[in-house]
């Protein structure tokens, strides 16, 4: 199912959506933060999807617990370190970990740039102990408005040498991409690549805007592109990568069932598309789960899954020499 001669990558993976249950428990107790349960076992349903839950509101509540326990910069560093460990232990050869420093900082009023530094330090420490290649993507969380995104951008750009790209995430309907055109001009001027959450809650116009105005060369989720034949043609022609997260899309009610997921439609249209976990801590999944789902629920053959693996490497924010090195390590 997973082809061991091809690098296994996860390109759409939120660091702040992957906090271990026991880490939430330990940090909560360490910092005197009231948790919604009185044991580790009973905490899990409050912070992870259980069974067939499919509600965006429930999903976001669980996600909020992951940052509620980030009471100091050591906690941030720990979570970043554990993200590297989790990526390696799940069998990944390469992962791009994205994070929103504003979202991580806000509960306990941590310094935004300090959060960025703590994430970088935690990842560096993790890379000393685990065999996996990691790059970082900064997120601007549009839900908090333009001014907050400016603060976030400045904290991230102060350490741009440790980032490969910038992302726009959050409330796509309430805060459309055009509000952030100036922010992304600064990102382009800084020489960083751009990906954007688009076409998830909003329609295809949001994706056109992200590509044509923000400068995105990859799109997170993008499920609504399938209703716009011109966009599908454009995506295929220009190799705009779709970072697909099927289980997360089900958990957030972006799609009502795996049968409704447009992954196959993208593949049949020749669009570059990869499989990713999104918020693996909340969804309680790993990358291998997504490949199993792609085979059993989305109907992909082993040959198609191998192509999806290759797509991920092609889409990655890597130099050609880094791409070749990933393949060489699998030979």
Curated annotation (Swiss-Prot):
Disulfide bonds: none annotated. The keyword Oxidoreductase does not apply. It comes from the Bacteria. GO terms for molecular function: 2'-deoxyadenosine deaminase activity; adenosine deaminase activity; zinc ion binding. It catalyses: adenosine + H2O + H(+) = inosine + NH4(+); 2'-deoxyadenosine + H2O + H(+) = 2'-deoxyinosine + NH4(+). Binds 1 zinc ion per subunit. One of its GO terms (biological process) is inosine biosynthetic process. This is Adenosine deaminase. Catalyzes the hydrolytic deamination of adenosine and 2-deoxyadenosine. It comes from Shewanella sp. (strain ANA-3). It holds the Pfam family A_deaminase. GO terms for cellular component: cytosol. The keyword Metal-binding applies. SUPFAM superfamilies: Metallo-dependent hydrolases. Substrate binds at residues 14, 16, 170, 279. Its EC number is 3.5.4.4. The record marks 221 as: Important for catalytic activity. Belongs to the metallo-dependent hydrolases superfamily. Adenosine and AMP deaminases family. Adenosine deaminase subfamily.
